[in-house]
Amino acid sequence: MAKEKKEKTPGYEEFHDALQSGTVGNVYIFHGEETYLMQQAVTELQARLVPAGFEEFNYHRLAGKGLTMQEVVEAAEAMPMMAERTLVTVEDMDLFRLDEAQRGALVALLGDFPEYCTLVFLYRQIPYKTDAKLKKLTAALAERAQVIEFAQQGQQKLQKWVRRRFAAAGKEIDAVTVDHLLFTCGSLMTGLVPEIAKIAAYARGPKIAMADIDAVADPVLDARVFDMTDAVAARDYDKAAECLAELLRMQEEPIRILAALGKTLRQLYTARLAIDGGKDVLWLKDLWRMKSDYPAKKLMQSARGVRRSWCREAVKRCQTLDHRMKSERNMDSEGELKLFLMELAGVK
């Protein structure tokens, strides 16, 4: 039980530091939403363990729904060729949902694991969920495997990383513009890599401007929904309707749009309460656990255009529509979403 209650799961930095010091584990479980860093860790393992030109013999990649534990065992037990160790990666095998025979095979492998092998279970598309009721498997993994969580990076690390990426492309970017990029494109490095490349290629000058980002970046859902809500608050229904139409053209599910809209409306409500109560941007940032004050500033600015009563009613109506979408059959969800937006624009 003590292992399940540890304060902090090791992340990329701990893994990287250990690898740099020469410490390589035998079994890893990689999980978390920052798949860019997860792949970076796999690349570092490959560079350390697998000699160039011998990947076919010493680096075994396994994946697929039909993958069996027997295949994993065979790959793990395969002897290295012209190298001291082998690397085996297994993608999206849900260890705690294996049948009893497969779990038994995994426990047996972990109990007598070849020292020359490093086995990595990669949770890319599925979440990593343990099950304490499976005591033998839980104990075997606790004894043999290292769990590494690749979580979203903090604001300071992202700022430095974004600047390095742009610098590699011969461009500069200031802190405020980085904040705008993260607000627009999200905070996951995996999604930021292609956006940074696209923006750097588009920008004509040596320094990236917000206009460069707005011109070519693909905003994440939350950013698009904020623009839609901001347009409603500014009484610009045409722009709000255009934002919604664009989301629907992109085949975003109405229920996902409504969920994001509900969150934005709640944030807008608290921003209005902050204004009425004499609270500042930092109060709002801390309340919503935002990484920077940039989105909080945008919310406060938008909230100045609406009344508290409007915010309260908007949140209530959103909750009602959410319940209806989830409970009523054959609902015209797109039509109801458009109608809801019109109602928001019509009541101030």
Per-segment meaning from a language model:
Residues 1-348:
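Conserved beta/loop motifs at nucleotide-recognition and modification sites
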